[in-house]
């Protein structure tokens, strides 16, 4: 949620920034008109209440003097009715203001490139050079099916499209990957591991910005207030929902492995094969709580934490800064890490690391008491560290051999009983 005071004080700046995020100027003008009307009514209500209190005092005096107070009583009744009507109007205007405010995206940081879509994204850096194969590299789904470690056909039979079974060494590889990621984040990067709920209420989904705007992207439990999490960002960020932290506790680092459930609404025809776009997948998530002063420093660290995993796995990747039109709803700035996928001859997203500043904290009421004793909204950050299925896909493709086998990255071998190859 945006800071309403900031909007009122910087209308033109906010309007300009929201426009870069695809928000029509009229939307903000409509909000401001409603808000101005609401505030004007509040002033009027306060004046009427003040008048009612004054009349109430007069009535008390008249009654003590045993004088007629009928006129004053009538006047107070009329004022009370006016207040009741105006209070209802205030509530109605507040509901309209809230409906608009809840759907306004976060304002982009000044360093974010301006653009309508991914074409305006800016590459920051690359790590390693993609391997040159002496043969035509196969896509990961062909490799996995040939080795008998991925079964998309039976996944579709049981659950429909975009589901699969990991089998044998495929399941073991998936497990090795996420255990390696968790160990790195806990032992090397300083995160506290959490096992969160996989079902959350609508309040939690609102807090991180999925609700109300993106309800069609998730799986909701029928006749319930619960939703299957689209990412562990939701339960991890809401851990401190409606709480006040102490500044000395910050920054706080959480990491969690969880399944993620997404309807992939609007993705028809995209990545219909393989592990890139599924309805259910594992992801290791990183979440941070920071003060305002250090949140962008923490974003750089988080991005490096994700990159460290890829580097230790020996997977070539690049980092890009997302443009204003390509960022997620709650983000003020986002870095995407994209891993090299040989069969597609391109880089594909494997992690998004975002600083949401105080946007989510305002929605979820996550605050901290600073050194002066004042209560401030915390800054929240989140990032994939990493998407596990996409990491498995990248390993299968980058480490494939001409004979159809796959070499296991050295750092994963201790997690796979010393195996060096999948054959």
Curated annotation (Swiss-Prot):
Q: Where does ATP bind?
A: 262-264, 349-352
Root EC class: ligase
UniProt-listed CDD domains: SerRS_core
Cellular component terms, GO, for this chain's entry? cytoplasm
Record's InterPro entries?
aa-tRNA-synt_IIb, aa-tRNA-synth_II, aa-tRNA-synth_II/BPL/LPL, Ser-tRNA-ligase_type_1, Ser-tRNA-synth_1_N, SerRS_1_N_sf, SerRS_core, tRNA-bd_arm
Q: Which residues bind L-serine?
A: 231-233, 285, 384
A GO BP term here is: seryl-tRNA aminoacylation
Recorded E.C. number(s)?
6.1.1.11
Reactions it catalyzes: tRNA(Ser) + L-serine + ATP = L-seryl-tRNA(Ser) + AMP + diphosphate + H(+); tRNA(Sec) + L-serine + ATP = L-seryl-tRNA(Sec) + AMP + diphosphate + H(+)
Q: In which pathway does it act?
A: Aminoacyl-tRNA biosynthesis; selenocysteinyl-tRNA(Sec) biosynthesis; L-seryl-tRNA(Sec) from L-serine and tRNA(Sec): step 1/1
**Primary residence:** cytoplasm
Any idea where this protein resides? Cytoplasm
| UniProt GO MF annotations | ATP binding; catalytic activity, acting on a protein; serine-tRNA ligase activity; transferase activity
Organism superkingdom: Bacteria
Notes on the domains? Consists of two distinct domains, a catalytic core and a N-terminal extension that is involved in tRNA binding.
Q: What does this protein do?
A: Catalyzes the attachment of serine to tRNA(Ser). Is also able to aminoacylate tRNA(Sec) with serine, to form the misacylated tRNA L-seryl-tRNA(Sec), which will be further converted into selenocysteinyl-tRNA(Sec).
Q: How does it assemble?
A: Homodimer. The tRNA molecule binds across the dimer.
HAMAP family of this UniProt entry? Ser_tRNA_synth_type1
Kindly provide the name given to this protein in its UniProt entry. Serine--tRNA ligase 1
Which organism does this record belong to?
Answer: Enterococcus faecalis (strain ATCC 700802 / V583)
């Amino acid at each position: 949620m945006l800071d309403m005071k900031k909007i009122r004080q910087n209308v033109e700046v906010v309007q300009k920034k929201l426009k870069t995020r695809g928000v029509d100027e009229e939307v903000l003008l409509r909000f401001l008109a409603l808000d101005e009307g609401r505030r004007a009514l509040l002033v009027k209500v306060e004046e009427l209440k003040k008048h009612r209190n004054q009349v109430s005092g007069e009535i008390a005096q008249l009654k003590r003097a045993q004088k007629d107070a009928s006129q004053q009583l009538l006047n107070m009744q009329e004022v009370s009715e006016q207040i009741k009507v105006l209070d209802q109007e205030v509530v109605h205007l507040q509901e309209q203001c809230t409906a608009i405010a809840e759907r306004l995206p976060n304002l982009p940081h000044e360093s974010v490139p301006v653009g309508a879509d991914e074409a305006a994204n800016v590459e920051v850096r690359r790590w390693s050079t993609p391997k040159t194969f002496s043969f035509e590299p196969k896509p990961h789904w062909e490799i996995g099916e040939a080795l008998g470690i991925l079964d998309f056909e039976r996944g579709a039979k049981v659950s429909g499209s975009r589901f699969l079974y990991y089998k044998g060494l495929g399941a073991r590889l998936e497990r090795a990957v996420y255990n390696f990621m968790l160990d790195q984040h806990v032992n090397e990067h300083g995160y506290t591991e959490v096992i969160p709920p996989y079902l959350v209420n609508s309040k939690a989904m609102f807090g991180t910005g999925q609700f109300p705007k993106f309800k069609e992207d998730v799986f909701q439990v029928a006749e319930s207030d619960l939703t299957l999490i689209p990412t562990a960002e939701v339960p991890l960020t809401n851990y401190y929902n409606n709480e006040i932290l102490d500044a000395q506790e910050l920054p706080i680092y959480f990491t969690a492995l969880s399944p993620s459930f997404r309807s992939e609404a609007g993705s028809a025809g995209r990545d219909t094969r393989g592990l890139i776009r599924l309805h259910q997948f594992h992801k290791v998530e990183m979440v941070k709580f920071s003060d305002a002063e250090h949140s962008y420093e923490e974003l750089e660290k988080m991005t490096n934490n994700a990159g460290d995993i890829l580097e230790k796995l020996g997977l070539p990747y690049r980092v890009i800064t997302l443009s204003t039109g390509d960022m997620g709803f709650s983000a003020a700035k986002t870095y995407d890490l994209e891993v090299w996928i040989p069969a597609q001859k391109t880089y594909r997203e494997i992690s998004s690391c975002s600083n949401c500043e105080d946007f989510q904290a305002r929605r979820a009421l996550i605050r901290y008491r600073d050194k002066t004793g004042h209560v401030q909204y915390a800054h929240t950050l989140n990032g994939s560290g990493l998407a596990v299925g996409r990491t498995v896909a990248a390993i299968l493709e980058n480490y494939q051999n001409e004979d159809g086998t796959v070499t296991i990255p050295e750092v994963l071998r201790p997690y796979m009983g010393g195996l060096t190859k999948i054959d």
